[in-house]
């Protein structure tokens, strides 16, 4: 699982995500069950691979030997042959049991082999003739009931099939009795050899002349090493003795004393050991490297050194960088870059990345000569807890590229993983070329596999010329063998038969050649013959296909072909389009091996692989006679814009059109193209047919895709959608280019910068929506409701606007500092725009008004709770704004008893300002209405009686962020004022007194007139008598006329006249 994740990550970083090691084990060696084992034997803990077999250590196994039946877990070495069904049998290095004996001649003789961990460390070359070194670091001797954990090693000069126990050599250099425990001057006893643990690490030099064993417990865990060697005559190339060295002090059996080279206590020097050719002035001399992971104050250290009798001479020191990372847990010496000098890899498996633990890392030190090293850290790709670098192994040059490769184990990454790193001219390549995961993700009965804790060297066990290697999984009691596939290199070329093809040619022949090579000496079939898959593409990057193979294949042809060591060539014919004869045509040939290695443990005997770092394609061009002075035409394209403006008023147009002219003043311009982009990422309102848009960049073919000769011109009109355009400026960049060189590239580009302006006409209106207020009686309160509208007539859309409303709430009395409040209720303000309730902000510049108004507002309504109070005017200030005059509305109001409250008159009026902000993308768009409803209660109870009319003039202003002069818009206002009429009420007592006084005055006047005879009316009596007499005469005359008519009296008139004379009255009027 870990490797699957790692491979995914590595695939993103590099094409090298698998290589020539089989991805799954090709065979498995399992622990031969022995009697008495109750826990894991750790079969596979350490490995030494040979030509046809592998030595496998099981340091916790019980022995089947009769002499060791009563010994608990002495450890067993197994030899497993690859050609005999992977059968494993004990390779009995030590056939004897425990021995109880007294010291002899000052040397311990008792041997206790219980839990001695035989095979805890092993080393040896890959040939059967190489020496073989096996150690048991927990071997101990008993003397006077004291256990001395000296450690013991065994070595053989070679590994014959049938081992002779007499040929096994024991190495027990720490058996000196008097050095087991030392007494200091203060009588304290310290362990010296008694906890030495010789063989915790083991190493056999490449020339088989030296055996180096680590003993990190010597002298209170200062640590040291033991060296068995054949002493050569060491001279430099000039015949002079090497600096700092005395050949007389060379030893066959060397036990350096830590006190002689100043080793730090508890530093564990000798924890890991190796050797190599580090001295660039003498590359024939072997020097040693050993680590002390708890040295350097637990930062860890390692030394390159030589040994002389009882001390060492240090040539170079390596130091860890992090406390507790266990720098020096493992060490590997190998020439990684092929320069002949041995490089060094030191692991730190407890190295932790941030927010992680025990990730692990390896420090790679590239030898630059004269004991100077270039350091590089490769951090774990295995994740937290994997302990990358627990084991390191030299696997040789597995891909035959001339550089040695290494394997790095991370046995605690799940069930364990192993990473393959390839050498190169610059050291190790990173990332790894391959990751091998434990075959199973399920834990064994003993827990996680610890796959990778055992790593063998590389050895070609199947004879195909490439090194194979084995991986041990101690907790699974198994060893997995991984074989390597041969690596071949594909050599392929593609080329036209003719150079500079004539423009009139309709067909062109091309030649394709290919062959295989390998640096391996093997003559295996996999190298001799491989099938290739070849694909040829014509002009893949061209949008217009200018050449094809034929109607059947089009511009792509694929085929399979056998490849050998010898080069094979084939010819193909390409049909040319007339448009292509002046344009170079790209031919790209891709190739790969047809047969892939199986994604399983089955090994394919006739398969091979190609180094993923090698190219997988080759490109060539068909070129034509250009008709120019040289093979390469030099054009001189020039671009200009004929209708560009320096200013754009936003909203005046939905589409911005720019027309560009392109002229060629040079030689032929092939594939002329025009591209345009803009700083605002505007989309195109229209895309011409010869253009394509990709991520706001439009690219167009000029001259219908044909070449442009000298003097040719073309033009394009580009239409940008500017409906959503915002900002202060717009930069439009246009460029023309061709497939060939340009003589004057400066005029190929043109940048137009347009200054963006906003312009809008805003209309503001306000009216009172309820009836005019007339207050006739106490408490002289009434609600006033105003409605306001704000509308922009454009053309621009405005943003970052603030609408401010000013409401008069109080006034100052003349010649006084007192303030009288006329708005004492809780004004409610609600605003809507674009179907949204707008938030209201109360602004009190000096907090003075807040003393009188308790504020309670939410997203939709603003409330001011007020109580009328008299305040000192010194604490208040109005809106500072000059206004030359204040009119009294359209109504004819008396000036002397009318009070006008206007927020611009700061000497009289005190106002409450509120704000509505259009922010967070909200914009005032043309013809979209914004409204505001304001209601408040006026209270004129405490107003001065001299005022009969109160005029409240609210004001509304608009501001824009970044436009202090309001140059981007104009405002027309029509806001009606609120007029409140107050008629004073007459007191009852005044009415009663007035009535009584009136009655008294009336009575007195009447009596006076009576006394003066005003009420005597003589003329009235005469008129009554006259009326009465007239009425009586009328009756008499009527009777007389009636009588005369009845008697026919002709003298009636005379009788009437006579009657009139007697009465003295008129008979006619």
UniProtKB/Swiss-Prot annotation:
Pinpoint the residue ranges of every FG-GAP repeat in the record. 29-89, 104-165, 184-237, 255-310, 312-374, 375-430, 437-499
Q: What is its main location?
A: membrane
Q: In which tissues is it expressed?
A: Expressed in lamellocytes (at protein level). At the anterior end of the oocyte, expressed in the follicle cells that will form the operculum and the micropyle.
- Transmembrane feature ranges: 986-1006
Is Repeat found in the keyword set?
yes
Topological domains, Extracellular: 19-985
The Gene Ontology biological process terms listed for this entry are: cell adhesion mediated by integrin; cell-cell adhesion; cell-matrix adhesion; heterophilic cell-cell adhesion via plasma membrane cell adhesion molecules; integrin-mediated signaling pathway; oocyte growth
| UniProt xrefs under Gene3D superfamilies | Bicelle-embedded integrin alpha(iib) transmembrane segment, Integrin alpha, N-terminal, Integrin domains. Chain A, domain 2, ntegrin, alpha v. Chain A, domain 3
Q: What does this protein do?
A: Possible role in cell adhesion. Minor involvement in the establishment of the oocyte anterior-posterior length.
Name this protein carries in UniProt: Integrin alpha-PS4
Q: Give the species this sequence originates from.
A: Drosophila melanogaster (Fruit fly)
């Amino acid at each position: 699982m870990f490797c699957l994740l790692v491979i995914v990550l590595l695939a993103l970083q590099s094409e090298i995500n698998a290589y020539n090691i089989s991805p799954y084990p090709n065979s498995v060696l399992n622990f031969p069950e022995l009697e008495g084992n109750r826990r894991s034997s750790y079969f596979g803990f350490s490995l030494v691979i040979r030509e046809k077999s592998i030595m496998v250590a099981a340091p916790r196994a019980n022995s089947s030997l009769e002499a060791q039946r009563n010994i608990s877990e002495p450890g067993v070495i197994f030899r497993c042959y690859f050609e005999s069904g992977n059968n494993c049998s004990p390779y009995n290095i030590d056939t004897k049991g425990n021995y109880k004996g007294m010291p002899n001649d000052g040397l311990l003789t008792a041997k206790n082999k219980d839990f001695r961990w035989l095979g805890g460390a092993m080393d040896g070359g890959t040939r059967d003739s190489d020496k073989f070194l096996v150690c048991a670091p927990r071997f101990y001797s008993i003397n006077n009931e004291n256990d001395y954990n000296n450690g013991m090693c065994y070595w053989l000069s070679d590994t014959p099939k049938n081992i002779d126990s007499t040929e096994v050599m024991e190495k027990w250099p720490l058996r000196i009795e008097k050095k087991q425990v030392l007494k200091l001057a203060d009588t304290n006893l310290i362990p010296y050899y008694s906890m030495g643990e010789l063989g915790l690490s083991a190493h056999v030099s490449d020339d088989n002349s030296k055996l180096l064993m680590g003993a990190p417990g010597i002298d209170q865990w200062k640590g040291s090493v033991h060296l068995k060697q054949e002493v050569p005559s060491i001279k430099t190339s000039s015949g002079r003795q090497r600096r700092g060295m005395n050949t007389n002090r060379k030893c066959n059996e060397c036990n350096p004393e830590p006190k002689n080279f100043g080793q730090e206590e508890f530093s564990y020097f000798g924890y890991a050991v190796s050797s190599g050719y580090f001295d660039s002035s003498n590359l024939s001399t072997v020097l040693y490297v050993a680590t002390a992971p708890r040295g350097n104050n637990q930062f860890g250290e390692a030394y390159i050194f030589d040994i002389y009798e009882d001390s060492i001479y240090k040539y170079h020191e390596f130091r860890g960088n992090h406390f507790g990372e266990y720098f020096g847990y493992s060490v590997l010496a190998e020439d990684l870059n092929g320069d002949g000098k041995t490089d060094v890899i030191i692991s730190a498996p407890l190295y932790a990345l941030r927010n992680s633990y025990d990730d692990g890392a390896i420090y790679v030190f590239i030898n630059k000569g004269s004991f100077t090293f270039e350091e590089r850290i490769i951090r774990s790709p295995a994740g937290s807890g994997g302990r990358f670098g627990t084991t390191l192994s030299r696997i040789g040059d597995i891909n035959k590229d001339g550089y040695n490769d290494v394997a790095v184990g991370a046995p605690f990454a799940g069930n364990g993983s192993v990473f393959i790193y390839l050498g190169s001219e610059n050291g190790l390549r990173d990332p790894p070329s391959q990751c091998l995961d434990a075959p199973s993700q399920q834990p064994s009965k003993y827990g996680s596999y610890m796959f990778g804790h055992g790593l063998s060297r590389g050895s070609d066990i199947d004879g195909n010329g490439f090194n194979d290697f084995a991986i041990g999984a101690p907790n699974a009691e198994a060893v997995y063998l991984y074989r390597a596939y041969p690596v071949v290199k594909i050599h392929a070329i593609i080329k036209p038969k003719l150079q500079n093809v004539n423009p009139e040619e309709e067909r062109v022949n091309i030649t394709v050649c290919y062959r295989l090579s390998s640096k391996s000496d093997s003559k295996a079939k996999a190298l001799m013959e491989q099938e290739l898959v070849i694909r040829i593409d014509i002009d893949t990057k061209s949008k217009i296909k200018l050449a094809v193979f034929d109607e059947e294949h089009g511009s792509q042809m694929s085929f399979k072909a056998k490849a050998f060591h010898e080069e094979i060539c084939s010819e193909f014919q390409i049909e040319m389009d007339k448009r292509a004869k002046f344009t170079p045509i790209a031919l790209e040939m891709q190739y790969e091996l047809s047969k892939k290695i199986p994604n399983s443990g089955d090994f394919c005997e006739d398969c091979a692989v190609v180094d993923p770092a090698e190219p997988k394609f080759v490109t060539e061009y068909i070129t034509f006679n250009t008709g120019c002075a040289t093979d390469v035409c030099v054009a001189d394209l020039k671009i200009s814009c004929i209708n560009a403006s320096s200013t754009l008023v936003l909203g005046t147009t939905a589409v911005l059109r720019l027309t560009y002219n392109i002229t060629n003043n040079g030689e032929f311009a092939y594939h002329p193209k025009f591209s345009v982009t803009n700083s605002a990422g505007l989309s195109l309102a229209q895309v011409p047919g010869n253009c394509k848009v990709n991520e706001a960049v439009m690219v167009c073919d000029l001259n219908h895709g044909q070449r442009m000769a000298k003097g040719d011109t073309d033009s394009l009109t580009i239409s940008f959608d500017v409906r959503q355009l915002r900002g202060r400026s717009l930069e439009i960049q246009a460029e023309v280019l061709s497939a060939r060189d340009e003589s004057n590239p400066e005029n190929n580009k043109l940048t137009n910068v347009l200054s963006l302006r906003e312009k809008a006409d805003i209309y503001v209106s306000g009216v009172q929506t309820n009836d005019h207020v007339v207050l006739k009686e106490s408490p002289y309160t009434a609600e006033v409701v105003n409605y306001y509208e704000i509308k922009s007539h454009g053309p621009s859309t405005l943003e970052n606007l603030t609408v401010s409303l000013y409401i008069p709430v109080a006034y100052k009395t003349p010649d006084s500092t007192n303030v009288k409040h006329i708005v004492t209720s809780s004004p409610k303000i609600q605003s809507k725009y674009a179907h949204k309730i707008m938030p209201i902000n109360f602004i009190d510049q000096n907090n003075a008004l807040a003393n009188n108004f308790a504020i309670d507002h939410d997203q939709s309504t603003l409330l001011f709770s007020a109580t009328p109070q008299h305040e000192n005017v010194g604490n208040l200030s109005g809106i500072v704004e000059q206004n030359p005059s204040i009119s009294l509305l359209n109504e004819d109001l008396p000036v002397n008893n009318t009070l006008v409250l206007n927020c611009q008159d700061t000497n009289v009026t005190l106002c409450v300002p509120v704000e509505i902000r259009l922010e967070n993308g909200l914009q005032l768009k043309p013809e979209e209405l914004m409204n505001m409803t304001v209601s408040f209660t006026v209270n004129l109870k405490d107003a001065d009686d001299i005022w009969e009319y109160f005029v409240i003039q609210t004001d509304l202003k608009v501001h824009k962020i970044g436009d202090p002069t309001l140059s981007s818009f104009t405002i027309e206002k029509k806001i009606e004022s609120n007029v409140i009429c107050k008629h004073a009420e007459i007191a009852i007592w005044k009415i009663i007194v007035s009535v009584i006084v009136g009655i008294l005055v009336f009575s007195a006047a009447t009596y006076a007139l009576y006394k003066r005879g005003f009420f005597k009316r003589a003329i009235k009596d005469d008129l009554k008598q006259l009326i009465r007499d007239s009425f009586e005469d009328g009756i008499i005359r009527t009777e007389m006329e009636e009588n005369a008519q009845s008697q026919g009296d002709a003298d009636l008139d005379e009788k009437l006249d006579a009657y009139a004379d007697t009465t003295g009255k008129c008979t006619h009027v």
